[in-house]
Curated annotation (Swiss-Prot):
GO terms for cellular component: endoplasmic reticulum; endoplasmic reticulum membrane; endoplasmic reticulum tubular network; endoplasmic reticulum tubular network membrane; membrane. Residues 467 are lumenal. Residues 343-434 are annotated as: 3HB (three-helix bundle) domain. The gene is ATL3. Expressed in the central nervous system and in dorsal root ganglia neurons. Expressed in peripheral tissues (at protein level). Keywords: Acetylation, Disease variant, Endoplasmic reticulum, GTP-binding, Hydrolase, Magnesium, Membrane, Neuropathy, Nucleotide-binding, Phosphoprotein, Transmembrane, Transmembrane helix. This is Atlastin-3. Belongs to the TRAFAC class dynamin-like GTPase superfamily. GB1/RHD3 GTPase family. GB1 subfamily. Mg(2+) binds at D142.
Length: 541
């Protein structure tokens, strides 16, 4: 397996080759370590493209194509390249070119395995003059195909979010229709991007275009932009009778993008879909597909349609785009953002959390019946016995509840449940102990006993002439009396609880030492009595 450094070096060499050679090409700028599911920005490659002298300070237009793998994203981008090169060289209206000319540019091929990994951009940045005379830099971006066999949900979300955050036009490439799961994935990915842009107060992203490929219902909605917009309006319509989840998805999309459009493309033809030798020649592509291409590409890239990249209302230059790439990739390399989860994992977590909460309620309610607020003091042994009984009852309930994810997945939640039950039991023990009358009056009893004992000791020592010792005992009596009055005030007012805790701790320590001493003395007396009995019996004989 190549190390990230070697992969980065290889990509940098590829970028250098593309820049040094007369022929432009795709350059990998975001590298994906699929085994480690990590990302790395090739700053050198990206800088070599965006910091060229003639474009570095121009406002940038970034057109990105994203979507599921093997759905023809790179194929569409190559037609965009044809259009831009045609406009650059001659501005000829027949930008599609020679019917016999193979399609070149971003790497693409037929088949079922993904061709692009990470994010690539075209090494040549196109300078286009808008109708007002302003020059802008146009960058084309290609992304890793989402949901291939090696990509996690986080991988897909990160790539989609990065491309959306750095593009002014995000083309969401879909096959045949806009399904509900497509919208849910879009919601997840854009929210993952919005999390990283926490300082954005406006709509965080600019233009989103749903590009629906292989559209099979032109009799309902015609090919192209007009039919696409009518179809999109219906698909994204929010109705009162819709489920809240469905409404939230649609509201989220509208809240994220300043402009949302849709374009319906027909199938490119049987030769394109099935022939392993197809190389992109126009003669092999269906006529109606080429007709719609001639409407789609100029709609996106016509100088009057170009939209500069903006972040928080400010236009971004090529130099600024490099800095944003560097900032965003650091966010996704860190651990500050939550990891997006699959629908199965999220549902399994919800199932287990609900089962654990229900089991916890069973334990809590049963313990409340035994030693709740209004219940009398309970022996600690009986309380522990009830705890074990109700804990097992709660665990049995958790295990019997049907949950998704399997036993291994649920075991972690069972352990968390046991920890929570342990904490509840400790709280019940403390609450039960506070009901013990002796426990309640333990501190004042110890203090009062100490006052009486020291007062008697003071009188006796004074009677036999030990005035210094008597005065010392009197001082101690005064201190204990102050402690007793202070403890009473704290219990009454609820203030200075730390001081009250210190007095309680001191009283408990004195009581423990006294009890231990009395216990040891009693054991010694009993032992002496047992040992001394045989000798007395012998003397009697």
């Amino acid at each position: 397996m190549l190390s990230p450094q070697r992969v980065a070096a290889a990509a940098s060499r590829g970028a250098d080759d593309a820049m040094e050679s007369s022929k432009p090409g795709p350059v990998q700028v975001v590298l994906v370590q699929k085994d480690q599911h990590s990302f790395e920005l090739d700053e050198k490659a990206l800088a070599s493209i965006l910091l060229q002298d003639h474009i570095r300070d121009l406002d940038v237009v970034v057109v990105s194509v994203a979507g599921a793998f093997r759905k023809g994203k790179s194929f569409i981008l190559d037609f965009m390249l044809r259009y831009l090169y045609s406009q650059k060289e001659s501005g000829h209206s027949n930008w599609l070119g020679d019917p016999e000319e193979p399609l070149t540019g971003f790497s693409w091929r037929g088949g079922s395995d993904p061709e692009t990994t990470g994010i690539q951009i075209w090494s040549e940045v196109f300078t286009v003059e808008k109708p007002g005379g302003k020059k802008v830099a146009v960058v084309l971006m290609d992304t890793q195909g989402a949901f291939d066999s090696q990509s996690t949900v986080k991988d897909c979300a990160t790539i989609f979010a990065l491309s959306t955050m750095t593009s002014s036009v995000q083309i969401y490439n879909l096959s045949q229709n806009i399904q509900e799961d497509d919208l849910q994935q879009l919601q997840l990915f854009t929210e993952y991007g919005r999390l990283a842009m926490d300082e954005i107060f406006q709509k965080p992203f600019q233009t989103l275009m749903f590009l629906v490929r292989d559209w099979s219902f032109p009799y309902e909605y015609s090919y192209g932009l007009q039919g696409g917009m009518a179809f999109l309006d219906k698909r994204l319509q929010v109705k009162e009778h819709q489920h809240e989840e469905i409404q939230n998805v649609r509201n989220h999309i509208h809240s994220c993008f300043s402009d949302v459009t849709c374009f319906l493309l027909p199938h490119p033809g049987l030769q394109v879909a099935t022939s392993p030798d197809f190389d992109g020649k126009l003669k092999d592509i269906a006529g109606e597909f080429k007709e719609q291409l001639q409407a789609l590409i100029p709609y996106v890239l016509n100088p009057s349609k170009l939209m500069e990249k903006e972040i928080n209302g400010s236009k971004v230059t090529c130099r600024g785009l490099l800095e944003y790439f560097k900032a965003y990739i650091k966010i996704y390399q860190g651990e500050d953002l939550p990891h997006p989860k699959s629908m199965l994992q999220a549902t399994a977590e919800a199932n287990n959390l609900a089962a654990a909460a229900s089991a916890k309620d069973i334990y809590y309610n049963n313990m409340e019946e035994v030693c709740g607020g209004e219940k009398p003091y309970l022996s600690p042994d009986i309380l522990e016995e009830k705890h074990c009984e109700f804990k097992q009852l709660a665990l049995d309930h958790f295990k019997k509840t049907k949950k998704m994810g399997g036993k291994d997945f649920s075991f972690r939640y069972q352990q968390e449940l046991e920890e929570e039950i342990k904490e509840l039991y400790e709280n019940f023990c403390k609450h039960n102990g506070s009901k013990n009358v002796f426990s309640t009056f333990r501190t004042p009893a110890v203090l009062f006993t100490g006052i009486v004992a020291l007062y008697i000791a003071s009188g006796l020592t004074g009677f036999i002439g030990l005035e210094v010792v008597a005065q010392l005992f009197n001082c101690m009596v005064g201190l204990l009396l102050i402690a007793l009055l202070t403890w009473g005030y704290i219990r009454y007012s609820g203030q200075y609880r730390e001081l009250g805790g210190a007095i309680d701790f001191g009283a408990a320590y004195v009581l423990e030492q006294a009890s231990s001493h009395i216990g040891n003395s009693t054991q010694a007396t009993v032992r002496d009595a047992v040992v001394g009995r045989p000798s007395m019996d012998k003397k009697a004989q």
